[in-house]
């Protein structure tokens, strides 16, 4: 019964659309009505600026961490349940009951699950993700490639549960980023205003 409660609470925690909440409360802006119309961190940066975007990023990570940690908080001593219950938060973020079962791409929320499951691995994954952003200037590419590398890393360490969950999340990322991949192919994917990719695009535009 407690485990069922954990799954339900994890869904409702994961479903909190912090991008929408922060935008409306502090910026009087609905980020769903501009940019990519997504509720996640990238569009929050675009619509709310670096401070608002950073707040959304941290909150989306922490809600994944809190949701995944529910079994531990309720005294269930099976660490592997952190990953399983955490998936309910990903489902909540992707299909949020608060915004008519629409949602984001669950990148930050997935990172929060990893933080609860293996904090050192989270630090490594975050460093990889940020390095890929500096290299490509595209969050979509950094998120997808980062998940591929996390999956490979978990294979090296024979963490089969993490490998399975990472593979599942990779499929979700690929599906949710389909529009991004089409824009990449067309050469007009949105970029962050820094990094090598942005520099090269600007340099080509001047030549």
Swiss-Prot record:
Entry GO terms, CC: plasma membrane
UniProt keyword list: Cell membrane, Lipid biosynthesis, Lipid metabolism, Membrane, Phospholipid biosynthesis, Phospholipid metabolism, Transferase, Transmembrane, Transmembrane helix
A Pfam family annotated for this UniProt entry: G3P_acyltransf
EC number: 2.3.1.275
Record field: catalytic activity: an acyl phosphate + sn-glycerol 3-phosphate = a 1-acyl-sn-glycero-3-phosphate + phosphate
Disulfide bond sites: none
GO BP terms in the entry: phospholipid biosynthetic process
InterPro entries (alphabetical): G3P_acylTferase_PlsY (IPR003811)
Keyword rRNA-binding recorded: no
Top enzyme class: transferase
GO molecular function: acyl-phosphate glycerol-3-phosphate acyltransferase activity
Pathway connected to this protein: Lipid metabolism; phospholipid metabolism
Keyword Glycoprotein assigned: no
Subcellular locations according to the entry: Cell membrane
Membrane spanning stretches: 2-22, 47-67, 72-92, 121-141, 155-175
Entries under SMART domains matching the protein: G3P_acyltransf
Family note: Belongs to the PlsY family.
Free-text function comment from the UniProt entry: Catalyzes the transfer of an acyl group from acyl-phosphate (acyl-PO(4)) to glycerol-3-phosphate (G3P) to form lysophosphatidic acid (LPA). This enzyme utilizes acyl-phosphate as fatty acyl donor, but not acyl-CoA or acyl-ACP.
Subunit structure: Probably interacts with PlsX.
PANTHER family the record matches: GLYCEROL-3-PHOSPHATE ACYLTRANSFERASE-RELATED, INNER MEMBRANE PROTEIN YGIH
UniProt-recorded name of the protein: Glycerol-3-phosphate acyltransferase
Organism: Lacticaseibacillus paracasei (strain ATCC 334 / BCRC 17002 / CCUG 31169 / CIP 107868 / KCTC 3260 / NRRL B-441)
Phylogenetic classification of the source organism: Bacteria, Bacillati, Bacillota, Bacilli, Lactobacillales
